């Protein structure tokens, strides 16, 4: 009977940004800035086919890309480029993955099952089996934040294996448990395998991988260094570990630096060239070239954004900046959006507005002592420019520079005017609020 293809990856890559500031993270959304932000390639072109009923071990040193590969297969992390084909429902088990620290173990069981689309009746029917399998006992009603790593792994494993997934991804979940629970988990995994389910087993334990897995993928600093039968791959891996463990500490550090440097300096162009060289431009090379370009085309969030989307994002950022400035300046949002030109002038040109009339007479905010004193001052120093024609009463014209905290009513009151009179002299304040630095015309009315 021919086995069904369950998982296929073609030239999977995963690039992570090493941006340290928010501005750098924002730059990664736009291709014009992307080359200026350092990156790190956790995967550098991983291709493998996995069939139903297979248990695949994923091994490698720390930082080799094991968890990144398992997260992409489980749908947690999107790939940067390459093709991923999944035929079936995937469930991932890692230490504490998806658990809410503030909820109890029992509440986490219900929450995760609900998130997977199960109904309360279905959950009630199997929650006791999950609790019994987890071996947590009375601790099932304690907050998960009080659990040890082994207890968290037991809970996560118990929930996942009771979901009946087609593809099970186990990321170090059995490495922290005791031998009794490991044997129970192993028995469950073998039962899944007999049912034709596919299992990905990520582990540092060569013994566990040797006991469980049919084939092994050896990850090495983002590369799939080898993929094949467990016996042959583990023989190569043990030989590598023997050499590596005999390195001095400086030699190990140098080896790790070289591997990580290659991950930082990797590019999709390099991957294209390497694959095309292997193809040797044989018959059908045009098709091969087309496929290689397709699978090595970056598929990042910023590249998916259309010009319109990017323009909208820039507009949104400008709007946030504009609203922030109006808030700092004490301008209402209604005014800011109804009269944007005047608002921008208030925000960016207050000093210039204040300096329009350097010879203007700046009056104080205090109310004049009396109309009589004003009349005496006018009689002593009459000004022909301050006496309008065809007016029976004497009037003095002056200016006032608006200060912080002023209002139209306060200025009018302090200078013996009504609001209507002040608005008549300064019609621009009828619709647009006053702002600090604005120069207003005043006419103090006297009898």
Swiss-Prot record:
Binding site for ATP: 60-67
Family matches, as SMART domains: AAA, LysM
Membrane topology listed for this record: Peripheral membrane protein
Family statement drawn from the similarity comment of this UniProt entry: Belongs to the ABC transporter superfamily. Teichoic acids exporter (TC 3.A.1.104.1) family.
Name of the protein in its database record: Teichoic acids export ATP-binding protein TagH
Family matches, as PANTHER family: TEICHOIC ACIDS EXPORT ATP-BINDING PROTEIN TAGH (PTHR46743:SF2)
Pfam families in UniProt: ABC_tran, LysM
Single GO MF descriptor: ATP hydrolysis activity
Residue ranges of every copy of the ABC transporter domain listed in the record: 24-246
Record-level GO cellular component terms: plasma membrane
Subunit description: The complex is composed of two ATP-binding proteins (TagH) and two transmembrane proteins (TagG).
Biased composition (Polar residues): 360-369, 379-393
Function summary: Part of the ABC transporter complex TagGH involved in teichoic acids export. Responsible for energy coupling to the transport system.
């Amino acid at each position: 009977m021919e086995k069904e293809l369950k998982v296929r990856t073609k030239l999977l890559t995963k690039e992570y940004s090493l941006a340290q500031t928010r501005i750098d993270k924002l730059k990664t959304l736009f291709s014009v800035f992307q080359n200026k932000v350092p990156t790190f390639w956790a995967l550098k072109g991983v291709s493998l086919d996995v069939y139903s009923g297979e248990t695949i071990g994923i091994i490698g040193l720390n930082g080799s890309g094991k968890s990144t590969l398992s997260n992409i297969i489980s749908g947690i992390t999107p790939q940067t480029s390459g093709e991923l084909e999944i035929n079936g429902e995937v469930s991932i088990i890692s230490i504490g993955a998806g658990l809410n620290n503030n909820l109890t173990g029992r509440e986490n069981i219900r929450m995760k099952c609900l998130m997977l689309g199960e109904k309360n009746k279905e959950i009630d029917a199997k929650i006791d089996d999950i609790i019994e399998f987890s071996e947590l006992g009375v601790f099932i009603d304690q907050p998960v934040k009080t659990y040890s790593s082994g207890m968290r792994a037991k809970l996560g494993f118990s929930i996942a294996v009771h979901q009946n997934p087609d593809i099970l991804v186990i990321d170090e979940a059995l490495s922290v448990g005791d031998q009794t629970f490991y044997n129970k988990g192993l028995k469950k995994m073998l039962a899944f395998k007999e049912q034709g389910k596919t299992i990905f087993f990520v582990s540092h334990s060569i013994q566990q991988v040797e006991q469980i897995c049919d084939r092994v993928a050896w990850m090495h600093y983002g590369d799939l260094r080898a993929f094949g039968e467990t016996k042959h791959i583990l023989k190569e891996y043990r030989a590598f570990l023997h050499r590596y463990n005999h390195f001095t500490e400086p030699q190990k550090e140098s080896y790790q630096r070289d591997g990580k440097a290659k991950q930082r300096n990797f590019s999709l162009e390099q991957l294209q060239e390497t694959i095309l060289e292997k193809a040797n431009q044989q018959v059908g090379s045009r098709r091969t070239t087309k496929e290689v370009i397709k699978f090595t085309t970056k598929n990042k969030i910023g590249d998916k954004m259309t010009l319109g989307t990017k323009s909208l994002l820039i507009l949104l950022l400008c709007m946030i900046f504009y609203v922030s400035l109006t808030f700092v300046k004490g301008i209402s949002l209604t005014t800011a959006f109804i009269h944007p030109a005047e608002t921008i002038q208030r925000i960016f040109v207050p000093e210039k507005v204040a300096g329009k009339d350097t010879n203007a007479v700046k009056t104080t905010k205090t109310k004049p002592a009396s109309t009589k004193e004003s009349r005496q001052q006018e009689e002593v120093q009459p000004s022909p420019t301050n006496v309008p024609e065809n007016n029976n009463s004497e009037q003095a014209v002056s200016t006032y520079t608006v200060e912080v905290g002023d209002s139209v009513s306060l200025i009018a009151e302090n200078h013996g005017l009504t609001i209507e009179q002040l608005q008549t002299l300064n019609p621009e304040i009828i619709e647009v609020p006053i702002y600090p630095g604005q120069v207003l015309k005043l006419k103090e009315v006297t009898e």
